[in-house]
């Protein structure tokens, strides 16, 4: 047993950085997300570390003495949380900061630093970003989780097997070391990241005038750090939902689904389970439909009469293929079939999914008339993306349908704050503009001293001229340049943007290989800047194992694959190869050399490593650059808006949604977004508004 510390023991005099970590009881975290806004949990204790001290202050543990909860929050709020001169460090700051704000009623002041965000900008390709994983890799230290588990099992006589969900049931003396280790690791990580990694020069760029530009992670980390308070406010504010309208819509969708099934039943006497292929098979048989594919044949192990598995001459189980009788029914097959009942199944499925996944899904997360979704700022164990774009969860508002009647009805459920209209601000063709920006930056066609093919120079001049028109359509401009349809131009453009190969592109265009080859040659001859940009970025990524975006967000290519690949005529592509870390790739290459040469000779050929191996996924270089730069632009716009007192509510793809109280506010939002990061061509933001999200125009 040990005495609990007193708040007066915490000495913050002369301290500029403090690490903070909370232990909580958050029972609905896995099903409904962070519980701080709903207040359906509580903080059990607060761990604090400075360069000289570490404490764990218990406030809500069972079977132990605790500090007075109200007094503790009041004291720490005054001395620490509201002190603008002390930097606060967290790991997964969104979680702890939201609980602190929930408990105190105030947003923390001063710089809020997150070692999970730092770890992500330092290496966005990691698989895990937990405190334990990061600490193990960077500090060679781990959390005391397993030690705590053993102690709790012994203390509880095996009754408590997972202390992580039962912290409130444990006495202070069991939790103290674990909590203090967590907060100490957080502080150590921050000190290491700040000293060694955030200002580490990863690339030196030489400008045309000969000056040097040093690229580090610091700039993008500062952008993400400035954005963080905005996201906390977005989380707490949430977005209003018309609950009664949602309930009515759910009933209408259910009725529509059931009516469709009744029609099928009336005319065929078949009860269809719309999501079960085996059930739909009965309808196919009734309608004498046989033009469908079947699922793959099932493998079955052969057995003798006693039930023993039979073996072949290699000692492996004998296998026979059992012919499948289950129909393979993709949506396109059902949707385009001449049989009206199959088309009805598609409509019934749409109604069923909209009701169960979206309407009821939204209602499950409504708290006092609003939804407070979890916003995943950057790559983490909770979500986020490798490109820096947001993801959302609990619920995922980015998956709300947008097309068709159902999409419109779903979006009508989202309503603005009282006295406001719903405003939607959408970057117009954000990704193509970024492509044009980089093409004009890397290939300054106006400089006569720079050699380049005439068709490249002419295409760049034409594309830059086209952007002097406010309503320019990139895909139409390229279509006119290449003398092809807009549909074809858009498909090729997006295919190149997303790293799509020729075979996949031909399939998307519904062309034969020969037809596609002619089309691509025409496209690349008339609009060569897209292909050249893509190829040059691939080469840069292979040479440097990284790219950097408009906001200096690094895109790393630190996995490796062999160059020695064989073509498979059956699948009409190269055989897949393993993706390896650099160390594993070098070990694999060494093993290949040892098979070919004697041990002492093999080392002499290790210098040929890059002749046989290359960074993997570099074909995605252009896409990574586009997506990362778009994320930078959107996040910079959100920071700029927040600093003007304007709070976004939903961010989806290239769109920001918020409640608009005046035309002046709408004008500020539009101009701020367009000027967040300036390009070689003008940005354009389309503004639409209405009484709800579904009625904007």
Q: How would you label these PLM feature ranges?
A:
Residues 2-8:
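A short, well-structured beta->alpha microelement
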């Amino acid at each position: 047993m040990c005495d609990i510390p007193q708040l007066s023991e915490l000495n913050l005099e002369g301290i500029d950085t403090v690490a903070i970590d909370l232990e909580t009881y958050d029972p609905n975290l896995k099903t409904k997300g962070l519980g701080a806004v709903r207040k359906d949990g509580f903080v059990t204790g607060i761990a604090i570390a400075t360069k000289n001290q570490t404490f764990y202050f218990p406030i809500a543990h069972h079977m132990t003495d605790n500090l007075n909860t109200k007094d503790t929050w009041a004291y720490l709020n005054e001395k620490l949380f509201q002190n603008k001169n002390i930097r606060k460090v967290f790991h997964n700051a969104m979680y702890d900061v939201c609980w602190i704000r929930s408990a105190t009623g105030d947003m923390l002041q001063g710089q809020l630093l997150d070692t999970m965000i730092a770890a992500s900008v330092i290496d966005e390709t990691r698989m895990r970003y937990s405190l334990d994983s990061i600490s193990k890799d960077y500090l060679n230290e781990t959390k005391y989780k397993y030690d705590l588990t053993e102690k709790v099992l012994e203390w509880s006589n095996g009754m408590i097997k997972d202390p992580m969900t039962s912290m409130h049931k444990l006495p202070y003396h069991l939790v103290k070391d674990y909590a203090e280790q967590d907060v100490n690791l957080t502080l150590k990580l921050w000190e290491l990241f700040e000293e060694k990694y955030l200002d580490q020069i990863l690339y030196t760029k030489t400008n045309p005038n000969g000056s040097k530009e040093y690229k580090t992670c610091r700039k993008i980390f500062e952008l993400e750090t400035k954005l963080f308070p905005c996201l906390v406010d977005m989380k707490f504010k949430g977005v209003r939902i018309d609950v009664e309208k949602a309930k009515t819509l759910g009933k209408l969708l259910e009725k529509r689904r059931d009516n469709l099934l009744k029609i099928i039943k009336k005319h065929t006497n078949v009860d269809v389970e719309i999501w079960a292929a085996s059930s739909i098979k009965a309808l196919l048989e009734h309608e004498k439909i046989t033009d469908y594919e079947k699922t793959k044949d099932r493998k079955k192990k052969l057995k003798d009469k006693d039930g023993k598995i039979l073996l072949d001459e290699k000692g492996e189980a004998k296998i026979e293929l059992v012919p499948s009788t289950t129909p393979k029914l993709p949506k396109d097959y059902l949707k385009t079939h001449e049989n009206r009942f199959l088309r009805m199944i598609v409509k019934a499925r749409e109604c069923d999914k909209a009701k169960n996944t979206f309407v009821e899904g939204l209602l499950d997360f409504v708290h006092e008339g609003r939804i407070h979704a979890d916003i995943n700022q950057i790559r983490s164990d909770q979500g986020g993306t490798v490109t820096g774009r947001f993801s959302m969860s609990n619920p995922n508002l980015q998956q709300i349908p947008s097309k068709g009647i159902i999409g419109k009805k779903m979006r009508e459920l989202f309503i603005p704050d009282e006295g406001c209209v719903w405003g939607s601000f959408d970057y117009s063709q954000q990704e193509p503009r970024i492509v044009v920006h980089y093409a004009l930056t890397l290939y300054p066609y106006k400089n006569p001293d720079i050699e380049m093919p005439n068709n490249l120079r002419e295409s760049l001049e034409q594309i830059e001229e086209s952007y002097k028109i406010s309503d320019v359509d990139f895909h139409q401009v390229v279509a006119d340049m290449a003398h092809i349809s807009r549909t074809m131009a858009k498909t090729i453009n997006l295919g190149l943007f997303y790293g799509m190969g020729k075979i996949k592109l031909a399939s998307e265009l519904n062309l034969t290989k020969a037809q596609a080859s002619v089309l691509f040659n025409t496209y690349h001859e008339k609009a060569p800047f897209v292909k050249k940009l893509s190829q040059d970025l691939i080469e840069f990524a292979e040479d440097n194992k990284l790219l950097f975006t408009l906001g200096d967000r690094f895109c790393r290519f630190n996995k490796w694959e062999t160059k020695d690949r064989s073509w498979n005529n059956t699948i009409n592509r190269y055989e897949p190869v393993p993706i390896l870390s650099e160390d594993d790739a070098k070990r694999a290459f060494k093993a290949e050399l040892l098979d070919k040469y004697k041990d002492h000779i093999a080392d002499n050929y290790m210098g040929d490593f890059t002749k046989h191996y290359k960074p993997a996924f570099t074909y995605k270089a252009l896409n990574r650059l586009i997506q990362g730069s778009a994320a930078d632009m959107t996040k910079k716009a959100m920071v700029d808006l927040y600093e003007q007192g304007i709070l976004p509510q939903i961010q989806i793809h290239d769109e920001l949604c918020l409640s608009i109280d005046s035309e002046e506010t709408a004008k500020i939002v539009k101009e701020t977004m367009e000027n967040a990061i300036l390009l070689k061509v003008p940005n354009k933001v389309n503004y639409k508004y209405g009484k709800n999200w579904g009625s904007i125009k």
